[in-house]
Amino acid sequence: MYVVIMGGGRVGLTLANLLISDGHDVTLIENEETLCANAAVELDALVICGNGTDIKTLEEANISNADVFVAATGNDEANLLSCILVREYSIPKIIARVSNPDHEEAFKKVGIDHVISPERTAAGYLEKLITRPKVADLIVLGHGDAEILDMEIRSSKVVGKRVGDVSPTDKYIIVAIYNNGDLIIPQPDMVLERGTKVSVLVKTDAVKEATRRFTG
């Protein structure tokens, strides 16, 4: 899948890293020189220092071949304008980050597929919305107080322990285990081995705690 992301801030950069690690092709557009330079160093992807509201920049990003476009800057007006321009290229999926909830209706009126409000702008949620839309529906619960994290077990705190000894807690629950790419429903007596990939439903305020718990 080819994804073009506009915005090299925290959300855009983290989203790009998640997609790249999943094997997707990514181009990131950022017009602020420092952020652009940082992204170019961090990402194994094409980084374009330019304005995503400029057609020339979008075409440099090969926008016509994109499967997904994500407007992830903190500027609602720039996000809206870029999405309007990108619609002309018939991109299958367009996603816009909206910082001010009052602006959501404007995005919807111009036909943007997915308008993501502040409580849903976690990069993990956006990544699921792109790669696994059905899973994304499960991620944000209530008013955005939980999300699903995909992690590889590396911490000695959980390696060798049974699922039932680790999960559930009042902060998180293991919802899936992956074995050679196959999804397995966790059972209490399953042993967690180093390198095993798991999906964990975590309360938003416990994301750092859960990440340390499973990855060290």
UniProtKB/Swiss-Prot annotation:
* Top-level taxon of origin: Archaea
State a single Gene Ontology molecular function: potassium ion transmembrane transporter activity
| One cellular-component annotation, GO | plasma membrane
- What SUPFAM superfamilies does the annotation carry? NAD(P)-binding Rossmann-fold domains, TrkA C-terminal domain-like
Residue ranges of domain RCK C-terminal in the record: 136-216
Provide the binding site for NAD(+): G7, G8, G9, R10, V11, E30, T73, G74, R97
Keyword annotations: Ion transport, NAD, Potassium, Potassium transport, Transport
Which part of the chain is the RCK N-terminal domain? 1-116
Function comment: Part of a potassium transport system.
Q: What is known of its domains?
A: The RCK N-terminal domain binds NAD and possibly other effectors. This is expected to cause a conformation change that regulates potassium transport.
Show the PANTHER family listed in the entry: POTASSIUM CHANNEL PROTEIN 2-RELATED-RELATED (PTHR43833), TRK SYSTEM POTASSIUM UPTAKE PROTEIN TRKA (PTHR43833:SF5)
Under what name is this protein listed?
Trk system potassium uptake protein TrkA homolog
Q: Give the organism's phylogenetic lineage.
A: Archaea, Methanobacteriati, Methanobacteriota, Methanomada group, Methanobacteria
